[in-house]
């Protein structure tokens, strides 16, 4: 199995083996003052061979904030490849941010594999916002 691309989305799901996305391909997000995480789904594109079917893989998302703070991993999940797939969608997840916002970097990787997909994300903090702190 090999990762080829990834992006954040407000909502993503698989319907009839097709990807349905709302609000995808973020380059920035806005959070309320004091937030330490943001909610998202991550869509991950991959190449799967016959040999990968039935095998278990570990998917990790690492995070780094603008001050150098790192969360490795920030999120991990394990899954078994059921069949030939071209993409995966995470369930709703919360990924960490530094409370002051700024340019963060999220890296999607498979355990014991070299491929990495890096997703830069500018986090804007809004004081007194109606956004819930997640």
Where are these regions (language model features)?
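Contiguous segments within soluble domain cores/interaction surfaces
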Residues: 2-134
């Amino acid at each position: 199995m090999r990762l080829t691309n990834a992006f954040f989305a407000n909502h993503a799901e698989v319907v009839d083996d097709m990807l349905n996305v709302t609000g995808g391909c973020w380059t920035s997000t806005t959070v309320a003052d004091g937030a330490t995480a943001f909610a998202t789904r991550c869509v991950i594109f991959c190449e799967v061979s016959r040999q990968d079917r039935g095998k278990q893989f570990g998917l990790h998302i690492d995070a780094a904030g603008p001050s150098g703070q790192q969360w490795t991993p920030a999120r991990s999940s394990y899954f078994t490849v059921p069949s030939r797939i071209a993409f995966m969608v995470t369930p709703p997840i919360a990924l960490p941010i530094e409370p002051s916002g700024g340019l963060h970097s999220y890296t999607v990787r498979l355990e014991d594999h070299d491929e990495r997909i890096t997703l830069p994300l500018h986090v804007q903090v809004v004081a007194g916002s109606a956004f819930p702190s997640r």
